[in-house]
């Protein structure tokens, strides 16, 4: 749902799938950067349907990712978000790391200690 990296004034919504990560296909875009005050309480939301993932911050739509309904979906794995599949919702504060090519880069000791507080997580099934 959200990833916050290195005390930036933004969060990221990112789709991690075989299609976007392993095959490195970025069409449609698999990520969005959204400015928000990370020191405030923020409400992050995700609406998931068979056709689209829609992300929100504080009630405002900030990003969407559509199901391309590829003919070779079994191979490409662009849309693993089916009701029969399991997947992870990520709420992440990325401090950095030593892994080569790490998105967050090395850990900056000036940002330590770091705290991420989560007040609640709610999952609701929408009736159709």
Residue ranges of each PLM-predicted region?
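GH16 jelly-roll
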Residues: 1-128
